[in-house]
Amino acid sequence: QGTSMLDLLRKNAAVPAGRAGMAIAVSAGNIVEVSAGLDAPAHVVIDAQGMLVCPPFVDAHFHMDAALSYGLPRVNQSGTLLEGIALWGELKPLLTQKALIERALAYCDWAVGKGLLAIRSHVDVCDPRLLAVEALLEVKRIVAPYLDLQLVAFPQDGLLRGGDGPFQHLENLKRALDMGVDVIGGIPHFERSMADGSRSIRVLCELAAQRGLAVDMHCDESDDPYSRHVETLAFETQRLGLHGRVTGSHLTSMHSMDNYYVSKLLPLMVEAGLHVVANPLINITLQGRLDSYPKRRGMTRVPELLAHGVNVAFGHDCVMDPWYSLGSADMLEV
């Protein structure tokens, strides 16, 4: 850097790959040098005291509209996914935009304090008022200077079930996209039948192709080894040329699938360029609830996915809400 003054010099830092005693130089908002023993003049000098300095954490799957709502209007007695969905349905009519914004902003403070600077949050679009969508779009605007909040239009109650008609939730989802929501979501395993689940995937992927958007679907969040919607998701991704734009979240049914079927499924996922998000804290809490013994852990097959070259990320999913009574926005815990 010669004699030029740096904006920031962070000294005595540990960085990933086990390197210690490193200095990190920042100028004009960019990291310009990382090296051992660097000692240049800077407007601000921070001694990291040997602590880890790394890129910010990313939460690839979260539900900010439900965060910090634990106990409203009651708690989940069974600890199951289905009771959590029913409980959220009881809470939705009681929601206000003010409360949604306050809880979401409080959670964003937690997240930033834990090193999270990017969150992909699903937001329920089944309420025709779209209160949660409006609230989280406002939160996204408020936190934009310091946190990248990406929103997924998520039909929590199913795309093709409920509402005032078979396509009410689809129309709500389209309205949410028009309002500025970034990604198309879905929940095929919660539709009324396997056929409707497959149909919902086809409809949503076609919408993504039309609008040039990414897809992130809750997929096969079940202990049922025959819940195989991820296969349909991979097929539609290839059919519509959505390679690299589609994510399957949860995929907990893969934990229970026959190994022969999985050996066929994994190459299909690779060909489609599917991304996968596992949510360990919530998956091991909600899955296996109907088992006697031994009880399944319910995690998808992360080692096998990685071995095949699938891009795998992790999410916190829930914090103190109808599905999970714990959580602290800590991705290291995840």
Task: Show the residue positions of the predicted features.
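N-terminal metal-binding scaffold of metallo-dependent hydrolase/deaminase domains
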Residues: Q1-P41
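Divalent metal-coordination and catalytic microenvironments
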Residues: A13, G29, G50, H61, ...
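Active-site gating loops and adjacent loop-to-helix segments of metal-dependent hydrolytic enzymes
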Residues: A67-L100, V183, H229-T247, V270-V276, ...
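Alpha-helical scaffold segments that flank or form the walls of functional sites
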Residues: Y70-H122, L130-I142, E171-D178
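Metal-coordinating catalytic core of metallo-dependent amide/deamination hydrolases
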Residues: L94, S121-H255
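Short acidic/polar active-site loop segments enriched in Thr and Asp
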Residues: L117-A118, D182, N311
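His/Asp/Glu-enriched, well-ordered alpha-helical/loop segment
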Residues: A214, F235-V246, N279-L286, R296-V334
